[in-house]
C-alpha cells in the first residue's frame, strides 16, 4: 500500500491527479493540505483523510510515501525543497517555480539527494507523441508548429485560483501555463541542448492583466524550427474549450492535429490517414499518475523530472525577455 498526500489542493488541476489516484488499487490517500484551511477541510472530508493548512505539518503528521504537490507557482520551489530535504518522493505540478534559476536549483538539489522528483510534462507520455516517433524518430523534424488558445483567464477567479492572473504568483500567463508543454516538446523532438529564441511576441492587450494573454514564439533546436502560439482568448466554456492546430514536418511525413482527438498523417508520397489519438495534455494525467507511482515503487526514474522542467523554464526566461515581459 502506497500512502499518498496532496498539497496545494485549491489548485484547479487537482481533479486531474486526485480522481485517477483515487481509482488506483493499493493506494491510500492519507492527507491533504492547502493555505486555505476551508478548502483543505472540504477535500479531506470527501476523502476521509487528514487535512492541514501547512503542508509541513501534514507531512510530519501523516508521513506519506509520495506527495502530489500543487499550489501557486511562486510557492512550488519551497514545497519541493522541503520534500527533497525530508526524503519524500513527489510529483510537482509544472512549471515548478517562476524562473529558470529556481527550477535549476531544485534539479541540482534533487540530484544531489537522489530524490524521486517527477514533473507531469505529460505530452511526453502521449499516444500522439508515440505515433509520431514510431514513424519518424529516425527522420528528424524540420518544422514543429503548435497552436493552442485556451479560455479567458476569468475562469481562474471562479475556480479558486485568482493568483493565476497575477504575474508575481504565476510567473506569467498562457506561455508558462499552456506553452510550456510545447516548448518542452520542441526541445525533446529537436534533440538539441542548445535552444535559440529567434523571435517572441507577448501581449496583455485583451484583458490588461499583469500576465500575457497571447504569445507567439519561434525557436531553433539544432536544425529544427519550432513555433508556439498560445493565449487566453477562446470564448467557450463547453467541451470545445480551445482553438488548436499542430503541424509537424519530417522528410517522410507531415502531421496535422486540428482537434484534441485526431491526428492526420501524410506520407511524402501523398498517402493520408487519420488516426484516433489524444493530442492534448488533459487525457494523459491518469496515465501519468499510474505510471509515476509504478516507477516510484520500482525505483525507476520518472519520464520527466526537475531537470527537464528546468530546461523548459530556462527557455521560457529567454522567451519572456525577448518578448519584453521581463
Annotated model-derived regions:
Residues 1, 59, 66-68, 115, ...:
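C-terminal helix-rich "cap/oligomerization" subdomain common to oxidoreductases
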Residues 1-46:
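N-terminal Rossmann-like dinucleotide-binding module
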Residues 31, 66, 143:
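Short, Asp-centered acidic motifs that coordinate Mg2+ and/or phosphate
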Residues 36, 47-107:
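Beta-loop-alpha module in the N-terminal Rossmann-like domain of NAD(P)-dependent dehydrogenases
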Residues 53, 92-93, 117-119, 257:
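Hydrophobic residues in well-ordered beta-strands that form the structural core
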Residues 97-156:
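A contiguous active-site-proximal alpha/beta segment in oxidoreductase catalytic domains
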Residues 161-241, 307-311:
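Rossmann-like dinucleotide-binding domain that binds NAD(P)(H)
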Residues 207-212, 221-288:
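NAD(P)-dinucleotide binding in Rossmann-like oxidoreductases
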Amino acid at each position: 500500500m502506497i500512502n499518498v498526500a496532496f498539497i496545494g489542493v485549491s489548485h484547479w488541476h487537482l481533479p486531474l491527479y486526485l480522481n485517477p489516484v483515487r481509482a488506483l488499487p493499493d493506494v491510500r490517500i492519507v492527507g491533504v493540505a492547502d493555505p486555505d484551511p476551508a478548502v483543505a477541510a472540504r477535500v479531506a472530508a470527501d476523502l476521509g483523510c487528514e487535512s492541514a493548512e501547512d503542508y509541513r505539518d501534514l507531512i510530519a503528521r501523516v508521513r506519506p510515501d509520495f506527495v502530489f504537490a500543487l499550489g501557486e507557482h511562486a510557492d512550488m520551489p519551497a514545497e519541493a525543497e522541503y520534500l527533497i530535504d525530508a526524503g519524500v518522493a513527489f510529483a510537482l505540478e509544472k512549471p515548478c517555480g517562476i524562473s529558470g534559476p529556481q527550477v535549476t536549483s531544485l534539479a541540482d538539489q534533487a540530484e544531489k539527494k537522489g530524490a524521486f522528483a517527477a514533473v507531469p510534462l505529460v505530452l511526453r507520455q502521449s499516444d500522439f507523441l508515440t505515433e509520431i516517433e514510431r514513424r519518424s524518430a529516425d527522420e528528424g523534424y524540420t518544422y514543429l508548429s503548435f497552436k493552442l488558445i485556451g479560455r479567458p483567464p476569468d475562469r481562474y477567479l471562479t475556480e479558486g485560483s485568482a493568483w493565476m492572473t497575477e504575474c508575481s504568483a504565476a510567473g506569467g500567463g498562457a506561455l508558462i501555463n499552456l506553452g510550456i508543454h510545447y516548448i518542452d516538446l520542441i526541445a525533446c523532438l529537436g534533440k538539441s541542448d542548445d535552444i535559440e529564441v529567434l523571435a517572441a511576441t507577448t501581449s496583455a492587450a485583451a484583458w490588461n492583466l499583469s500576465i500575457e494573454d497571447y504569445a507567439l514564439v519561434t525557436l531553433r533546436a539544432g536544425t529544427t524550427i519550432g513555433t508556439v502560439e498560445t493565449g487566453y482568448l477562446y470564448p467557450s466554456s463547453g467541451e470545445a474549450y480551445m482553438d488548436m492546430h499542430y503541424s509537424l514536418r519530417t522528410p517522410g511525413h507531415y502531421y496535422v492535429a486540428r482537434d484534441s482527438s485526431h491526428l492526420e498523417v501524410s506520407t511524402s508520397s501523398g498517402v493520408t490517414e487519420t488516426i484516433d489519438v489524444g493530442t492534448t495534455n488533459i487525457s494523459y494525467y491518469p496515465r501519468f499518475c499510474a505510471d509515476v507511482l509504478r516507477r516510484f515503487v520500482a525505483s525507476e526514474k520518472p519520464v520527466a523530472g526537475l531537470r527537464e522542467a528546468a530546461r523548459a523554464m530556462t527557455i521560457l526566461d529567454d522567451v519572456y525577455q525577448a518578448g519584453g515581459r521581463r
